[in-house]
Curated annotation (Swiss-Prot):
One Pfam family in the UniProt entry: DUF34_NIF3
Membrane-spanning residues: none
Keyword Nuclease: no
Residues binding Zn(2+) 2: H65, H326, E329
PANTHER family: GTP CYCLOHYDROLASE 1 TYPE 2 HOMOLOG, NGG1 INTERACTING FACTOR 3
One of the record's GO molecular function terms: metal ion binding
Keywords per UniProt: Metal-binding, Zinc
Assembly with partners or alone: Homohexamer.
UniProt protein name: GTP cyclohydrolase 1 type 2 homolog
Binding annotation for Zn(2+) 1: H64, D102, E329
Similarity field: Belongs to the GTP cyclohydrolase I type 2/NIF3 family.
GO cellular component term of the entry, any: cytoplasm
Length: 366
């Protein structure tokens, strides 16, 4: 399996297009044409993680947090530059799966909920997928070659199906005037043409490409085409809603999380003895969604990186919070390893996958 094949597999199961627009996911460092010798999953790509991959003989690291995020202005032999230089020197490929793994139904938030021992887990804050139905009109004799060109360039595909078009016949008319250079017809004379209306679906990201291809391969000098926007609720969403088997107090639930996740500290906002049943979870930094979670029926909102003033606002408004620290997302190391092994087994791919043993939490606790 080459890196390009691995990227295709990852994109199939955890589409990179579902990442937030501000995010930096995908192949950050590497060569798509090299063979994968082994995969190391990690929360962060630190120098220690790179050394671990080198020791194992693995040439691919898949990290949750992007190493290259805000931009790199120099590659010196220290700091982030040292990490990047070492990756390049040892021909190690670095792939980031950040918010696309956050919003995935099998992703970080699902992994956290399962690690906490919760049940009835479902995605919340579902994304809206945007598609376009494309319509254009073309002379009957040109239909086949035109569809072939669109299909060859990746359009009119639905899942595992290609060449997905709908056709309906009709009669078009036009009159070339002025300096027109018509493929069919004469200047100042109305022309009637047997035409076929061709329809097909595209993803939002294909819109400009579709327009370019239609203009390039349509026989008319000025082709007519429409893009009709269609929105559908996605399977992807930022956060999960889950339940405990039996009601417990907020304090007991916080203590239970600390034990289940094996993390050094947990903070909570709310009345210690308040009963908890439904839990909303957004790993990492999820503040901003706590009130929406309550409106959706959550008794407590679990996330990390909660600031003082956000906690105070929540306390004043009677919203229960539990801060499990950003590093709690480390559960994705084993979680992603399991997913990769399942995907590889299904495809009969024999590549070693290991979860990094390096603790990349920058904090020390007393």
């Amino acid at each position: 399996m080459k890196i390009a094949d691995l990227m295709t597999l990852l994109d199939h199961h955890v589409p990179f297009r579902t990442a937030e627009s501000w995010d930096n996911v995908g192949l950050l460092i590497g060569d798509e044409d090299v063979e994968v010798t082994g995969v190391l999953t990690a929360l962060d790509c630190t120098l220690e993680v790179v050394n671990e991959a080198i020791e194992k003989g693995y040439n691919t690291i898949i990290s949750h947090h992007p190493l290259i995020f805000k931009g790199v202005t120099s590659l010196k032999a220290n700091g982030y530059g040292l990490i990047i230089r070492k990756l390049i020197q040892h021909d190690i490929n670095l792939i980031a799966m950040h918010t696309n793994l956050d919003v995935n139904p099998h992703g970080v938030n699902m992994m956290l909920a399962k690690a906490m021992g919760l049940k009835n887990i479902s995605i919340i804050n579902n994304q809206q997928d945007v598609y376009y139905k494309v319509q254009t009109y073309i002379p009957k004799d040109n239909v086949g070659p035109f569809k072939d060109k669109l299909s060859e360039n990746g359009l009119a595909q639905e899942g595992n199906y290609e060449y997905c078009f709908f056709e309906s016949e009709g009669r078009g008319q036009f009159k070339p005037v002025g300096e027109a250079n018509p493929t069919i017809g004469q200047i100042d004379k109305i022309e009637y043409v047997d035409e076929v209306k061709i329809e097909f679906m595209i993803d939002a990201c294909q819109k400009s490409w579709a327009e370019q291809l239609i203009k390039q391969y349509h026989p008319y000098e000025t082709p007519v085409f429409d893009f009709i926007e269609i929105k559908q609720t996605s399977l992807y969403g930022l956060g999960v809603m889950a339940e405990v088997d039996n009601q417990m107090t907020l304090e007991d639930f916080a203590a239970n999380i600390k034990s289940k996740l094996n993390i050094p500290s947990v903070r909570f906002v709310g009345e210690s003895n308040q009963k908890i049943k439904r839990i909303a979870i957004i790993g990492g930094s999820g503040i901003g969604y706590e009130y929406q979670a309550v409106q959706q029926g959550a008794d407590v909102f679990v996330t990390g990186d909660i600031k003082h003033h956000d906690a105070l606002d929540a306390k004043i408004h009677g919203v229960n919070l539990i801060d499990i620290n950003h590093y709690s997302e480390y559960v994705m190391k084993e979680g992603l390893k399991t997913l990769l092994m399942n995907w590889f087994n299904t495809e009969k791919i024999n590549i070693d996958v290991e979860a990094s043993t390096i603790n990349t939490d920058p904090f020390e606790y007393i």
